[in-house]
Amino acid sequence: MRTLWIVAVLLLGVEGSLVQFETLIMKIAGRSGLLWYSAYGCYCGWGGHGLPQDATDRCCFVHDCCYGKATDCNPKTVSYTYSVKNGEIICEDDDPCKRQVCECDRVAAVCFRDNIPSYNNNYKRFPAENCREEPEPC
Protein backbone atom coordinates (compact mmCIF):
# COMPACT_ATOMS: atom_id res chain seq x y z
CA MET A 1 0.00 0.00 0.00
CA ARG A 2 2.83 2.41 0.88
CA THR A 3 4.41 1.83 -2.54
CA LEU A 4 1.14 2.60 -4.33
CA TRP A 5 0.88 5.86 -2.39
CA ILE A 6 4.38 6.87 -3.50
CA VAL A 7 3.54 6.04 -7.12
CA ALA A 8 0.38 8.14 -6.92
CA VAL A 9 2.24 11.09 -5.42
CA LEU A 10 4.96 10.89 -8.04
CA LEU A 11 2.43 10.83 -10.85
CA LEU A 12 0.52 13.85 -9.54
CA GLY A 13 3.27 16.44 -9.89
CA VAL A 14 5.48 16.16 -12.91
CA GLU A 15 7.76 19.04 -12.00
CA GLY A 16 8.07 18.64 -8.23
CA SER A 17 11.09 17.70 -6.23
CA LEU A 18 10.01 14.07 -5.77
CA VAL A 19 10.23 13.50 -9.52
CA GLN A 20 13.58 15.31 -9.63
CA PHE A 21 14.76 13.22 -6.67
CA GLU A 22 13.91 10.05 -8.60
CA THR A 23 15.94 11.37 -11.54
CA LEU A 24 18.94 12.23 -9.34
CA ILE A 25 18.93 8.77 -7.76
CA MET A 26 18.90 7.19 -11.22
CA LYS A 27 21.75 9.42 -12.45
CA ILE A 28 23.95 9.00 -9.37
CA ALA A 29 23.11 5.54 -8.00
CA GLY A 30 22.03 3.97 -11.29
CA ARG A 31 18.84 2.66 -9.70
CA SER A 32 15.21 3.67 -9.65
CA GLY A 33 14.42 5.34 -6.35
CA LEU A 34 10.82 4.27 -6.72
CA LEU A 35 11.65 0.59 -7.15
CA TRP A 36 14.57 0.32 -4.74
CA TYR A 37 13.93 2.86 -1.99
CA SER A 38 10.21 3.72 -1.81
CA ALA A 39 9.39 1.14 0.89
CA TYR A 40 12.73 0.29 2.48
CA GLY A 41 13.45 0.11 6.21
CA CYS A 42 11.81 2.58 8.59
CA TYR A 43 12.52 5.83 6.71
CA CYS A 44 12.58 5.22 2.95
CA GLY A 45 9.13 6.04 1.66
CA TRP A 46 6.34 8.27 2.87
CA GLY A 47 6.97 9.33 6.47
CA GLY A 48 9.32 7.59 8.82
CA HIS A 49 9.62 6.54 12.44
CA GLY A 50 11.69 4.38 14.74
CA LEU A 51 15.40 3.84 14.16
CA PRO A 52 17.12 3.52 10.78
CA GLN A 53 17.75 -0.17 10.11
CA ASP A 54 21.00 0.13 8.14
CA ALA A 55 23.14 2.60 6.18
CA THR A 56 20.64 2.81 3.30
CA ASP A 57 17.76 3.51 5.67
CA ARG A 58 19.96 6.13 7.36
CA CYS A 59 20.29 7.89 3.97
CA CYS A 60 16.50 8.29 4.05
CA PHE A 61 16.51 9.38 7.70
CA VAL A 62 19.06 12.11 6.93
CA HIS A 63 17.06 13.12 3.84
CA ASP A 64 13.88 13.42 5.95
CA CYS A 65 15.77 15.56 8.47
CA CYS A 66 17.16 17.72 5.68
CA TYR A 67 13.68 18.29 4.24
CA GLY A 68 12.48 19.11 7.75
CA LYS A 69 15.02 21.93 7.96
CA ALA A 70 13.86 23.49 4.68
CA THR A 71 12.00 26.56 5.86
CA ASP A 72 9.40 28.64 4.06
CA CYS A 73 8.95 26.10 1.27
CA ASN A 74 7.50 22.69 0.52
CA PRO A 75 10.47 20.45 -0.31
CA LYS A 76 8.31 17.72 -1.84
CA THR A 77 6.91 20.00 -4.55
CA VAL A 78 9.48 22.75 -5.21
CA SER A 79 11.35 22.49 -8.51
CA TYR A 80 15.05 23.27 -8.70
CA THR A 81 17.76 23.57 -11.32
CA TYR A 82 20.82 21.33 -11.42
CA SER A 83 23.40 20.03 -13.84
CA VAL A 84 25.60 16.97 -13.96
CA LYS A 85 29.33 17.56 -14.39
CA ASN A 86 31.81 14.69 -14.32
CA GLY A 87 29.19 12.47 -12.70
CA GLU A 88 28.49 14.95 -9.92
CA ILE A 89 25.27 16.89 -9.32
CA ILE A 90 25.68 20.67 -9.17
CA CYS A 91 22.77 22.56 -7.59
CA GLU A 92 22.44 25.84 -9.47
CA ASP A 93 19.60 27.86 -7.93
CA ASP A 94 20.25 31.10 -6.04
CA ASP A 95 16.92 30.79 -4.23
CA PRO A 96 17.75 29.42 -0.73
CA CYS A 97 14.78 27.04 -0.62
CA LYS A 98 15.45 25.53 -4.05
CA ARG A 99 19.17 25.18 -3.33
CA GLN A 100 18.55 23.51 0.03
CA VAL A 101 16.07 21.01 -1.42
CA CYS A 102 18.44 20.22 -4.28
CA GLU A 103 21.29 19.68 -1.80
CA CYS A 104 19.10 17.37 0.31
CA ASP A 105 18.32 15.29 -2.77
CA ARG A 106 21.93 15.33 -4.01
CA VAL A 107 23.33 14.16 -0.67
CA ALA A 108 20.75 11.36 -0.44
CA ALA A 109 21.43 10.17 -4.01
CA VAL A 110 25.17 10.02 -3.29
CA CYS A 111 24.45 8.21 -0.01
CA PHE A 112 22.36 5.60 -1.84
CA ARG A 113 25.17 5.08 -4.35
CA ASP A 114 27.80 4.75 -1.64
CA ASN A 115 25.70 2.21 0.28
CA ILE A 116 24.62 -0.08 -2.56
CA PRO A 117 26.91 -2.88 -1.25
CA SER A 118 25.08 -2.95 2.09
CA TYR A 119 21.54 -2.84 0.62
CA ASN A 120 19.57 -5.58 2.36
CA ASN A 121 16.53 -7.08 0.62
CA ASN A 122 15.17 -8.04 4.06
CA TYR A 123 14.35 -4.34 4.59
CA LYS A 124 12.36 -4.03 1.35
CA ARG A 125 8.67 -3.58 2.22
CA PHE A 126 9.70 -3.60 5.88
CA PRO A 127 6.65 -3.79 8.19
CA ALA A 128 5.97 -0.50 9.99
CA GLU A 129 5.33 -2.39 13.24
CA ASN A 130 9.08 -3.14 13.31
CA CYS A 131 9.80 0.58 13.53
CA ARG A 132 8.48 1.40 16.98
CA GLU A 133 11.69 2.42 18.75
CA GLU A 134 12.08 5.96 20.00
CA PRO A 135 13.49 7.92 17.03
CA GLU A 136 16.84 9.63 17.34
CA PRO A 137 16.97 13.41 16.88
CA CYS A 138 17.89 14.84 13.51
Curated annotation (Swiss-Prot):
Disulphide connectivity of cysteines: 42-131, 44-60, 59-111, 65-138, 66-104, 73-97, 91-102
Class in the EC hierarchy, top level: hydrolase
EC identifiers of the protein: 3.1.1.4
Tissue specificity comment: Expressed by the venom gland.
Keywords: Calcium, Disulfide bond, Hemostasis impairing toxin, Hydrolase, Lipid degradation, Lipid metabolism, Metal-binding, Platelet aggregation inhibiting toxin, Secreted, Signal, Toxin
Reactions mediated catalytically: a 1,2-diacyl-sn-glycero-3-phosphocholine + H2O = a 1-acyl-sn-glycero-3-phosphocholine + a fatty acid + H(+)
Cofactor note: Binds 1 Ca(2+) ion.
Cross-referenced InterPro entries: PLipase_A2, PLipase_A2_Asp_AS, PLipase_A2_dom, PLipase_A2_dom_sf, PLipase_A2_His_AS
Cofactor(s) of this protein: Ca(2+)
Residues at the active site: 63, 105
Main localization category: secreted
Keyword match Lipid metabolism: yes
Matches recorded under PROSITE patterns: PA2_ASP, PA2_HIS
Cell compartment(s), UniProt: Secreted
Pfam families the UniProt entry points to: Phospholip_A2_1
Source superkingdom: Eukaryota
GO BP annotations, alphabetical order: arachidonate secretion; lipid catabolic process; negative regulation of T cell proliferation; phospholipid metabolic process
Signal peptide positions (record): 1-16
GO cellular component: extracellular region
Record-listed Ca(2+) binding positions: 43, 45, 47, 64
Single Gene Ontology MF annotation: toxin activity
Statement: the UniProt record of this protein carries the keyword Nucleotide-binding: no
Family: Belongs to the phospholipase A2 family. Group II subfamily. D49 sub-subfamily.
General function of this protein: Snake venom phospholipase A2 (PLA2) that shows very low inhibition of ADP-induced platelet aggregation in platelet-rich plasma of human, rabbit and guinea pig. In vivo, shows efficient edema-inducing activities in rat paws. PLA2 catalyzes the calcium-dependent hydrolysis of the 2-acyl groups in 3-sn-phosphoglycerides.
Protein known as: Acidic phospholipase A2 Cvv-E6h
